[in-house]
Structures are given as C-alpha cells and as structure tokens.
Amino acid sequence: MNAKEFLIELLKFKSVTPNDDGALNFIAMELSDFEAFFIEKEGIKNLLLTKKFKDEGEHLAFGGHVDVVPAGEGWSNNAFAPVEKEGFIYARGAQDMKSGVAAFVDAAKNADFKGARLSLILTSDEEGEAIYGTKAVLEWMQERDMLPDYAVVAEPTCVKKIGDSIKIGRRGSINGKLLIRGKQGHVAYPEKCINPVHDFAPVLKLLAGFDLDPGSAEFSPSKIVITDIRGGMGVCNVTPNDLKLMFNVRNSPDTSLEDVKSYVEKICHGLNYELELKQSSEAFLTNIDNKIVQKMNESVQKITHEVPELNTKGGTSDARYFAKYGVKVVEFGVCNDRIHAIDERVSIEEFEKLCLVFKDLIENF
C-alpha cells in the first residue's frame, strides 16, 4: 500500500494510551525486511525495527508513538474511522503523531540508505506516563551496544506550514508543591490566629511569574508559573489552617532543580513551610552545527522551500530520552494546530511532503 493508504489504516487502530490495539504488529508487517524486536515492560508494548546495511558507518534512528489521547465527545465523525475531506484526513492521531510514524515507515521502506544501520523506535506509552516506552527501548539497545548515533522524533513541530519549525531541544519541567502552615481560628480574633494567606501574600509577588534566568538564544527564561492555590474551608468566619500552592517551571539548562529550591527557600524565609520539588523531564539541546541538525535543515528546505526556525519551544517529548542516552536528536513533523483537539486532522499535502523530507534525509545522510 502507498503512504496515504498506510496512514489511513494506522489511524483505524483505537490505540488510546497505553494500548497499541495491534498497531505495532501492523507496522512490523509493513517493514518485514527489518528485524523486529517487541520489547515489553510493565505491560507497555514497544517495537524496535532495525536493519543493518554494512559493518562500518553511522546509525540513524526515527522515533515515534502510536498511542493517542482519548477522543472525547463532539466529533463530526467516529474519531477512529478516518474521513478524507477537502485535502485533509480527519481522525484521532492524524497530527499527533500517526502521520509522523507513517511518514518515516514509508521513507524507511523506499529510501536508499548509505549508512550502517537504520532503526525505527516505536512505543504505545508517550501520551501517558511515558516511563516504560522509548526509555525502555533505549535501555534495551544500550545493553546490546545498539544505540543510534542520531535520531529524528517525528512529533508535529510545525506551526503555520510544513517546514517552518525544527525542534533542536526542549525545556525541562520541574513541578513544585508549597505548603504554608498557619493556625486556624475565629476571624473576629485575628490576633489569636496565624493566617497563612496573610503571611504568604507579600511572597506571592516574588514567586508568580519570576524568571529564574534571563533566557538565551535557544531558550526562553525559566519562569515560575503558579498552577493552583487554595486555603481555608470555604467559609467567611474561619481563618485557614494552611495554604497550598502548586507551580511549574519549564527550565532551560541554565536553571536546575537546586536553583529553584534555593530561590523559593530564600523568599519563604521566616515562614513555616514545606517545599516539594520534582524534575519530571530534563532540558536538552542539540548544537546547531551537529550533523543531524544540518541534514534535517537541508532536507526540509529542499522539499518544502521553507527556512525552518530552529527552536526549543513547546512542551516535552520522548526526544529527551534520546538526548539522555547521548543520541543527537531533532524533532520534525506536520503542523500541530489540532493536536489533542476535536476533529483532529492532517493535511494530505503536508503528510506527503513529510514523507519526502524523511526519504531525502535518509538518502543524503
């Protein structure tokens, strides 16, 4: 089947995270001349497809996920019965990211690779906890001395048109929970209470929206963003016993968890508080002079006639795991204007260009 037909079939699998619904087997059958390793961890299914072309040379990999978020209500059609209409294919996962997977499967099948090894790393655990997916496959590959030198993760990176954006890194994510203790009491006797809301009020303006670093050419500043704040019992005559606050920092490599801890401790000095911090993902950056960045840039410009912005915008992705294992990685895919949305769709023209970009990259790497 051709690339579009393959994508339509792939979109029919109801692969709501972490269930692959048979999609991984379907992909393995399409690339029957690749070695297939089904790697399962804690019930999560993953697939490594790999093909050796020669003994010496570079190992290029593509990464992606077949799992999707739930469709929800309000779709014009069944979210897992793809509809082709006015140049688009409508289905859950059309942009995020079965189009990317279908594109690199088609490229791997048809391109003439001159390197040593070509691999496809696929998981059904990216939209959920993302602990036993790509990370588990890379761990498996490391144990067998099979880690790739370079990788492309086919997440939907483009904003307005195919070719306008390549991700060369991602910010990390630090989650914070802050508890300010007080002493509950009657509102008519404030002198007998310790009101944590009043105590914390001067600190709030030092926390909310604060930039922990000035940013750089590649990264925006690491900003503290408050996501939840609550205290009290929902009544007007009792002061709160405590105040609970949650926040997130999308951090660049210039700001660490210890930097966040140090700043919060400084501004909360004198308060009775508890602070809990967790790094849920780590920042990374692939140098713009690296071969994978240069070659991807060349292929994108050649096929799309666009000059892509090389950036680190947006949330996190499985590319962080490649970087953690020392693999030089970039991300490139279709536009992301309808990811996780009702009536998610992908432009057929964009998808066809993506297939050509990946094919050109493989052949000229």
From Swiss-Prot:
InterPro entries, per the entry: ArgE/DapE_CS, Bact_exopeptidase_dim_dom, DapE_proteobac, Peptidase_M20, Peptidase_M20_dimer, Peptidase_M20A
Binding-site residues for Zn(2+) 2, renumbered to this chain: 96, 127, 340
Source species of the chain: Campylobacter jejuni subsp. jejuni serotype O:2 (strain ATCC 700819 / NCTC 11168)
Enzyme class at the top of the EC tree: hydrolase
HAMAP family per record: DapE (MF_01690)
Origin superkingdom: Bacteria
Catalytic activity: N-succinyl-(2S,6S)-2,6-diaminopimelate + H2O = (2S,6S)-2,6-diaminopimelate + succinate
UniProt cofactor(s): Zn(2+); Co(2+)
EC identifiers of the protein: 3.5.1.18
Official protein name in the record: Succinyl-diaminopimelate desuccinylase
Role according to the record: Catalyzes the hydrolysis of N-succinyl-L,L-diaminopimelic acid (SDAP), forming succinate and LL-2,6-diaminopimelate (DAP), an intermediate involved in the bacterial biosynthesis of lysine and meso-diaminopimelic acid, an essential component of bacterial cell walls.
Record flagged with keyword Zinc: yes
